[in-house]
């Protein structure tokens, strides 16, 4: 997958299909990938 910068200097990756590597805290910290916005809550990804 591709890795994106995250607050605090940590890096998270998003993989095509909506399965991220790592855990997103909230939608504001989530990158755009392949034209879709990914959003995570408590470590579970969603896309819309």
From Swiss-Prot:
Record key words, sorted: Cuticle
Superkingdom field: Eukaryota
GO MF terms, alphabetically ordered: structural constituent of cuticle
Protein name per Swiss-Prot or TrEMBL: Cuticle protein 6 isoform b
UniProt lineage: Eukaryota, Metazoa, Ecdysozoa, Arthropoda, Chelicerata
């Amino acid at each position: 997958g591709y890795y994106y910068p995250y607050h605090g200097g940590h890096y998270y990756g998003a993989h095509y299909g909506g399965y991220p590597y790592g855990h997103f805290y909230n939608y504001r910290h989530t990158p755009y990938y392949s034209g879709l916005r990914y959003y995570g809550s408590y470590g579970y990804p969603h896309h819309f």
